[in-house]
């Protein structure tokens, strides 16, 4: 895998608050190599390590995108939800930003059935099929469609398991991470000072609470994916 330059600037990361970890009482000792100091009761993340692993992650997603691989971005907490959907749409990735339904990947056959149902209902709605039904039946189907849109809207075009999963907040998305580990799907995870850095294939130490920090990390990964996709289109 070729190393590339991704213009990851330490001062820019500081302005985004990427270096602010959790309180010193709320930490995982395995994160010690990624912490540079304690300040006013919180751990400070070593941004040199952040830059190194973010760069590695960018190389990985660029390489995968240049070979036509598929990505899934997962971030369901309120602060991350909008950022995740916008980033995924920009990079033409699948995403989950409301709730991770247990077994979404490990029980893929069930997820596929839900997606087929979702597509059928969307077709019915577009062709005004609901209007031909009794009001009560139409209302039931509309509620079903609304629920499926909420939870599966970001993966409606997914036809198989993703090649790489990007996780925003390891603690929040632990179930998704475990499913990826079970299936052997490579993962890139944004990890704060309360996380285990040994679980994901590439762990990026960073503040997972600040919107600016999450945006910074996502923007770099999305740029790398878009560059890789351009390379794939040019070479195909």
UniProtKB/Swiss-Prot annotation:
Transmembrane segments: none annotated. The keyword Ribonucleoprotein applies. It comes from Arabis hirsuta. This is Small ribosomal subunit protein uS2c. Belongs to the universal ribosomal protein uS2 family. GO terms for biological process: translation. The gene is rps2. Keywords: Chloroplast, Plastid, Ribonucleoprotein, Ribosomal protein. The keyword Cytoplasm does not apply. GO terms for molecular function: structural constituent of ribosome. HAMAP family: Ribosomal_uS2_B. CDD domains: RPS2. GO terms for cellular component: chloroplast; mitochondrial small ribosomal subunit. Its main location: plastid. It is found in: Plastid, Chloroplast.
């Amino acid at each position: 895998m070729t190393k590339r330059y991704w213009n990851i600037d330490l001062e820019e990361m500081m302005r985004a608050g990427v270096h602010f970890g959790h309180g010193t009482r709320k930490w995982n000792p395995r994160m010690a190599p990624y912490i540079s100091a304690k300040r006013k009761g919180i751990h400070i993340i070593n941004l040199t390590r952040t830059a190194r692993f973010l760069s590695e992650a960018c190389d990985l997603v660029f390489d995968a995108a240049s070979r036509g691989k598929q990505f899934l971005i997962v971030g369901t907490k309120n602060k991350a939800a909008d950022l995740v959907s916008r980033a995924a749409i920009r990079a033409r990735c699948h995403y989950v930003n409301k709730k991770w339904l247990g077994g979404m990947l490990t029980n893929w056959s069930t997820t596929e059935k839900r997606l087929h149902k979702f597509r059928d209902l969307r077709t019915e709605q577009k062709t005004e099929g609901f209007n031909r039904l009794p009001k009560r039946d139409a209302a039931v189907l509309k509620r079903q469609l609304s629920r499926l849109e909420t939870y599966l809207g970001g993966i409606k075009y997914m036809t198989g398991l993703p090649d790489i999963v990007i996780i925003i907040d390891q603690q929040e998305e632990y179930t998704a991470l475990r499913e990826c580990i079970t299936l052997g799907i490579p993962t890139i995870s944004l990890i704060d000072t309360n996380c285990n850095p040994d679980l994901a294939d590439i762990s990026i130490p960073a503040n997972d609470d600040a919107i600016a920090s999450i945006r910074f990390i996502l923007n770099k990964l999305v740029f790398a994916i878009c560059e890789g996709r351009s390379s794939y289109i040019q070479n195909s």
